[in-house]
Amino acid sequence: VFMDVQDVNPEEKNENLQVLIRTYNRGEDAKWIYVAKSVEFDNLPNTVIGYYFGEDMFRLFKFSSLVDRDIRARHGFSFVAPVHNRTYFECTNYKNYVHQYPGSFHSLFYTVYRDLVDWKNEGTIAKTWNAFRSCNESYRYNPGVGYGKRGDILDAHVLKKNFFFTNEGQAIPCSNEVEGEICLCYINSILAQYAINLYTGQHKINGNLNLLPMPDYDTRQSDIERIVNAIIDIKRKWFSLDETNLEYHGLIAQMHIDTTIDAALNKMQEQLTADYTRYEELVKENDDLWMDLADIDRDS
């Protein structure tokens, strides 16, 4: 039995606690009284926080965690940023550079890719720096899912093949494309974002992410694949207009100027508005899908 007097003034706590005890002994309910079976805390990442979990979250944490499904988030390399990190448009010769994923600005599912790291002679020079750290080297070029470990909202992105992941831009290397799509959809869902914030702060380190439970998804796998591919198509289309992005395809070439520039811009704005509306619908559909799989009310 937990009686919440956290927000009560210190001089009033004793009296409030006595009132709550008498209320509980009479068999009456109060919103400051929380009753839970402590044995159910065994499924939680930290039993102390179990008192703050509602019934929906207790049920969610009965599902297998990512690590129990052999899906593991991993910490990556640490470089000396001013020395080794570059964006591709800063370089005139790419011979000594490899792609890296250092995290991203907030962007669900997909982001722009522009970052490189100096890896001359297979990192011989980079490794001489005291601040350099090599971690999970055998996974460094594997595709999967990447995410920035900092922030209140956990947003994940496609981690492309042959990209380094880092201590800031961490990764879930995936064994196949379908596994990557499923992880991408789940981690970007409101369910996963809410659940992980129950037991972490702003640093979503790989060990904490590995404890995140995932509902069984087999019955909705085809929907998951459809949603994630549709979202990626939309984002790639508009990110290809960003000239700082490696996937830049040219702005003028994609404007289809049949009459005037103003008309072409108006048409592009209409397409952007329509695509953004569709994107929001797909994100909501993904949220609802995972809430349904967890048997939690969509509007809770």
Language-model region placement:
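Small-residue (GG/TT-enriched) beta-loop-alpha framework at ligand/catalytic clefts
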Residues: N25, S38, R59, F63
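A subset of signal/propeptide-processing and intrinsically disordered low-complexity segments
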Residues: F41, F63-S65, Y147
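S-adenosyl-L-methionine
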Residues: V1-Q18, G27-E28, W32-V35, L44-N46, ...
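Flexible inter-domain linker/hinge segments
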Residues: V48-G54, R59-L66, I71, H75-G76
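Glycine-rich, aromatic-lined ligand/substrate-binding cores of catalytic
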Residues: P82-T92, Y97
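Intrinsic disorder/low-complexity segments
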Residues: S38-E40, G54, G76, Y88
